[in-house]
Amino acid sequence: ERAPADGEKRFEIYVREKAILNLQHERAYSALNLAVTPEEQAPAATENEATDAKKKKPAKDKRKGSADEVALARQWMCQNFFDVRTFGAVMTTFVKSALNCGQVRGPVQLGFARSIDPIVPQEVTITRVAITTEKDAENKNTEIGRKYIIPYALYRVDGYVSANLARKVTGFSEDDLQYLWKAIINMFEYDHSAARGNMAVRELNVFKHDSELGNAPAYKLFDTIHVQKKDGVIAPRNYTDYDITVDESKIPEHVTCTRMI
């Protein structure tokens, strides 16, 4: 495997489906030629004793490097994994013989999405004309299933990007930020699902400050974005049933708002 050049970034993903995190930690130590020897343990005399020893093994008694080695491993993980340098990660899995790559506080933090108006999930009954087994086919011709959908909902989520943490901790760059915007805008285009229907990102408003620590509190900027139902709309069933506005008169100096969508 080719090692990245100084300053070169890679766009691997640390947390993936079925990924084994400790193997990624080992990659960091191997790439940096950091040899760490696990603590020696006395062999158990019997299988039962081995099981008991495993149960009594304290979580803190794990394979780990020195503080300098952990710092180097953490830097390697940030350089190679886009999600680590973006969102951060806890890379101390507290597993026997696991390598410690430290903890990273990511500069990008996203809150939980909430619907603008109350929603009610709808249960849909599905009839399957195929039968699972030959025995079932003797007694029935169809099988019934259920799926839950939401007829329509508009969600809002607030997020934060810390330029200070990006510079000091993970090396998250302006190029990385542009990739993040593209990912957010297109995240449902490559992951369509019958259960989610025509889900899409409708608005992406970005507030940019001209100083590293910001020129205004985030909540004041979020309060300038107003979402409300249009007159006469009782139960929204479409995006056009809402009015979405940004009160630019309340945005302070040295802060700009860009509508990405």
Place the predicted regions along the sequence by residue:
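RNA-binding basic/glycine-rich loop and surface signature characteristic of RAMP-family CRISPR effectors
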Residues: 1-261
